[in-house]
Regions:
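PRPP-dependent phosphoribosyltransferase catalytic core
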Residues: 2-16, 145-190
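Active-site-facing substrate-recognition patch
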Residues: 2-66
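Residue-level signature of catalytic and energy-coupling elements of molecular machines
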Residues: 34, 69, 91, 161
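Short glycine-rich phosphate-binding loop at a beta-alpha junction
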Residues: 66-73
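Conserved acidic residues
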Residues: 67, 129, 159
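Short Gly/Thr/Asp-enriched flexible loops that form oxyanion-binding sites at enzyme active sites
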Residues: 78-87, 148
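Short, glycine/charge-rich flexible loops or terminal/linker lids adjacent to PRPP-binding catalytic cores
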Residues: 89-131
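Conserved G/P- and acidic residue-centered "switch" motifs that form tight phosphate/ATP-binding loops
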Residues: 136, 141
Length: 190
């Protein structure tokens, strides 16, 4: 996997990232006191930034052999489904407990402001399929770590975990240290 997007030179890539970062709304003390919530709805409202994010993901993976994109509930669906469509591959949702209608495999985890369980359909991934997991944001790494465990339980081969935003100070990478990680943006010290 390339360190940056193959068809975007470094200065253009940085300009795009700076423009996208400028559209992220930061909401202090939400959903609980002490948390700065990075609101991506502003990225979705602006057609240029939404397209740029989707294009960056597509450019990164367009030359790779990928079988399925796994998107994490709920904002990972927004980018993961577009990526799957553009790549011509299947999309597998990872949902909060009780939201999938068929037989599931579940994984509990701790996140930045609580506890949660996520699930995936037990027939969503076949042994050896090449998978990219997509979510909007990586903070403490609890959600992505649980999603990685679910994909591995089903026999998927994770090529990379991809995020629009990463909060490196919360050390989420440590929970998935054995995975390749791609983040379009980082918000440090916040």
């Amino acid at each position: 996997m390339p360190d940056k997007n193959p068809s975007t030179d470094n200065s253009d890539y940085q300009k795009i990232c700076d423009r996208i970062k400028g559209h992220v709304r930061s909401i202090p003390d939400w959903p609980i006191k002490g948390v700065i919530f990075r609101d991506i709805t502003t990225l979705l409202q602006d057609p240029t930034t939404f397209k740029e994010i989707c294009d960056l993901f597509y450019e990164r993976y367009s030359k790779e052999k990928i079988d399925k994109i796994v998107g994490i509930d709920a904002r990972g669906f927004l980018f993961g489904a577009v990526l799957a469509y553009k790549l011509g591959v299947g999309f597998i949702p990872v949902r909060k407990k009780g939201k999938l209608p068929y037989k599931t495999v579940g994984q509990s985890y701790t996140l930045e402001y609580g506890e949660e369980t996520i699930e995936i359909h037990e027939d969503g991934i076949q042994q050896g399929e090449k998978i990219v997991i997509v979510d909007d944001l990586m903070a403490t790494g609890g959600t992505i770590s649980a999603a990685v465990n679910l994909v591995e339980k089903l026999g998927g081969d994770i090529m990379e975990c991809a995020f629009v935003i990463e909060l490196p100070d919360l050390k989420g990478r440590q929970k998935i240290a054995d995975q390749k990680i791609y983040s379009i943006l980082e918000f440090e010290g916040e």
